[in-house]
Structures are given as C-alpha cells and as structure tokens.
Amino acid sequence: MKNIKNILSIVLLTFLLWGCEDFLSVNPQSELTQEAYPTTAADALQSTNAVYATLRDWHYHSGGFPILDIMSDDAHKGSSPDDAANTVGPYDDFTHSPTQDGLDRWWNVLYEGIRRANIVVQEVPTIEMNENLKNRYLAEARFLRGLYYFDLVRAFGGVPLVTSPEPELQVPRASRDDTFAQIIADLEFAAETLPPKSEYGGDDLGRATRGAAQALLARVYLFRGDFAQAESYAMDVIDSGEYGLEPEFVDANGQDGEHGIESVFEIGAVATGSVEGNQYANTQGVRGTPNRGWGFNRPSIDLREAFAEGDPRESGTIIELGDVIDGIEILGDSSTPDEMTDEQGNVIQIESYNRKVWIPGTSTNTQFGHNRRLIRYADVLLMAAEALNENNQPVAALIYLNQVRERARQGNASILPDITETNKDALRDIILHERRVELALEGHRFWDLVRTGEAPDVLGPLGFTEGKHEVLPIPQSEIDLSQGTLTQNEEW
C-alpha cells in the first residue's frame, strides 16, 4: 500500500552509502533540490515531507546508533575486529573524543532536520490553503523538531536553539532547561493539533499522530524525572484505545507489524536501496551466510543472560548461529567471531546478531526496507508503569507491566509469571529490567541507565566515567566553526 514512505521519494536526496568500509565516514547528503520557500499547498506538503526525510538520512538512522546501544551493556561494536575500529570502536569502550569521526555528522543531520522544520513553521502559515491541513503540517513539523531537539539534548545537554531557517551564524548554547522548554512547547502543540492514528490511512499512513506526540512527551518527562507529567501523557495514549500489543513479539519490530497496532511512530522505508530505503538493518545484518549485512551492534553476553529462562523474547532479539529463520540457516562469518571473557576469565567465541532487524530477502542489497520503530506501545506501557510506581501507585503500575509480560510469555503459563511486588524500590528495579529485555537493541538502554543514575555502576566496568560520559562531547569542528561561541561540555 502506498503511504508516506513512498511519498518521500519526491524529496530528492543523494543516498551515498554502499559499503561498510565507509561506516560513519560518508559525506553529508545533499540539500533539497528545490531550495525556494514554499508558496503553494503542494509546496507545503513537499516541505513537510522533507522534514520526515531526515529520519532516513544515513547519519540519523544508522550513523547515530553507536551512540545508543553500543554505549550500553546490551551490545558491542561487532563486525570484524578491524572494521570501523577507529570510528565505531571508541564508543564501545568510552574512548571517543570531541574529534570523533561521525559525531559531527550526527549533530549536523539533526540540525538539518530542524532547519527543514523551521521552514515549514515559518512559511506555511502564509500560504492560502485548507486551514486544517495547514495546521496539521505545522504540527507535524513541530513534532519532528521536538524529536530532533530531544535527540540533541539527551546526547549533548543544552544546545543552540534555532527556530528560524536563517539564524545568525554563531548561536550560543541554550541551557538544558531552555532546550527542554522548546521541546515541550513543540510537542504540546503537536499533541493538541495532530489527528489520532485511526484518522490516517493510505498516503498518510506513518505520519506523526496525536498519540506519537503524547508518547514522546511521556518519554521527555520521564527523562526529566517529572513522573506526574510522564504518567499523564502515557495514560493519554493508553486511554485513547488507538494502540495495542502485537500477538507475536517478533512482529513488534518485523515487517508484519509495520504501521500495526503496536507502532506509535516508525521510520518508513522500502527495499529499493534508494532514497525510499535505509540501511539500518543492513548495518546490523548477519555477516557471512546468509550475507544480510555488516554485523555491527552485536548483542552482548550480558544481554543474553538478562533474559529469564524460556523467555521467547531472547530468540526474538538475538540471532544465534544454527538458528533457522524463514527457512534460512544462520551460519554467520566464522572468520570474525566475537571474543568475550566470562566471569572466570575464560575467553569464549560467540557470534550473534540483532534479530529485530531481520528482513526476509536474498542478499545485502535487499536489506533497505526495515521500518525502524521509534516508539512502540510496549514502551508506552512500561513508561506508564514506571511513572505510576514513582507516583506511589504500585498496584496500577503492575497492570501495565504485566500486560507486557503476558504478551511475552506467548500463552505459556509456566514462564514469566505476573509480577506482584509492590515495594517501590524493588518494583523500580523490576520495571527497569523489563524495559531492558523488552526493548533491547532498540536504542533505549543507555538513556535508561543515564536517567536512572545506574550508568556508573552498570557501565563503569566498560569505561564509563561518572560526570563525563552521561553526555557526548560537542563536536570540536562545530566549536571551531563558531569561533568559540559554542562551549564544550565539562570534563570533555
């Protein structure tokens, strides 16, 4: 069915990444071919689509993931030992620096998305067109601007606030609080203005919705430690009745669940290897046989051991050698196994991959059609559970926590029993663990550890330094371009 992932092909971008030797080192994508500001309803649509197109930029969907899972205890660099050792490897052991290759490109692609959103916000109000559609475009742009700024503030702290397409050349950093205030204002406007998911269809399937804005607000407030607001927005999503859990866990991230009942917001893509696709799955796919990708972002032994015995989510998250998926036996690349050291100091060789990016196909050139889920309903349920527990409502929290576990057990009553714990501290730990095994390799774990204060204890053995590694360094190239207007994060 035609939908927004197909529509975005009208926004012509140069898609330049074709080999893993270029990982995190390709040139930024080109600008929109039509730089003139929008003046018609058709222009307004194209300009709004361009804001979404940033989601499929290499440096957003794949260039940014080392800053997510690889910095956590859920994954490590993967691929072969020498592949991207100097680009991705430093994120694995916290030896990255302000001049780290790729860091500036992630920063720049987020600001490019913001620039495109600013064009819509500034110019579309002046266009004579249907007012309801005009307001929807504005809300979509502000939702995406809020998303991009949230990515920035989590990663770097307070950042330059740019709300016009042509800002001053040297913009100082705003405070962290002011950055969050802009994010919340954008997302509140989106939540008040956007239609619910059920009102979209056909060409508009996959656009930002009221539920997506509310869910992102819940995530923002949870990161801020404002549990009252996090509870309120998570419950808005739940009470809307627009969402549910896929019956099968693998469908929550697989092709059969694209734009499905569990998807609150996802990056649409098609398997063409062109501007309609992305390489998020390709970068993490199985090396060797059946040759589905480059094998980055490999699950850690620690993640494997986090799953309870018999939890079906383990096989729905981790591909092991010898697994048979869609009739294909996974043999991997025996020449590049991962060498890990167990608690007894023994070196063991393990080769495993991210099951959540598996796509049926025949070669690496077909692995462009993965719709990456940015917000799942299971995440919303767990955000609600966490917020309710922090707000001294443990019994209510258990309702939503156990909904996630019920789906996970897949009808097997002998595993994953309902949680009954109501002690606040104990339940907090249980919910954080449930987030880990439910949302593994989806880019949440590092931020969960940072916001809960668990990062020093959990990641310290991997190289994490408290007071430094909660944020990334501001790219040195950006500080140089600003002639010192931008200041570096402390300890960096």
PLM regions and their residue ranges:
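Long, intrinsically disordered, low-complexity segments
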Residues: C20-F23, A41, Y52, A75-D82, ...
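Conserved, well-structured interaction surfaces
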Residues: L45-H59, P81-F156, R173-D177, L187-E199, ...
